[in-house]
Amino acid sequence: MQIGLCSLGDHRADPTTGIRTSQAERHANILEYLSAAEPLGFDTVVAGEHHFSDFIMAVPQMFLTWVAAQTSQVRLASGVTLLPHHDAVRIAEDFATLDVLSDGRAEVWVGKGVEPGLYRHFDQ
């Protein structure tokens, strides 16, 4: 069995204090969290793409590239890449580059997303 660690890039206020960190601080927290996967024995790191919401991971391959530089074995997966909003060739190139930089650890998981309003933001 393989077990992965996932972040969807949530950026919400603390339910107890109501305080919301800056985006830069939350990005740093996410990177620290994902980088801990390998030393803790997880097999895969998954970063999910989100736009225009309380989730701040618009380009998961950037996060995965950073994690690749900090690790040597953990698999690196998008969960998911919203293919309808991108040029498929560009996504293939991005993940092929990540795959080379990570010595073959990249996985691209694609989907259509769950937010119908997102298509308006991308003029679709």
Describe every region a protein language model picked out:
Residues M1-T71, R75:
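N-terminal beta1-alpha1-beta2 module of alpha/beta enzyme domains
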Residues Q2-Q23, H85-Q124:
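Flexible, glycine-rich active-site loops centered on histidine and acidic residues
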Residues G48, G79, W109-G111:
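Structural motif
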Residues H51, T81, G113-E115:
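Catalytic metal-binding/acid-base residues of hydrolase active sites
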Residues P60, W66-Q70, L76-S78, V100-E107, ...:
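Amphipathic repeat-derived elements
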Residues A77-H85:
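The substrate-binding groove and active-site-proximal loops of carbohydrate-active enzymes
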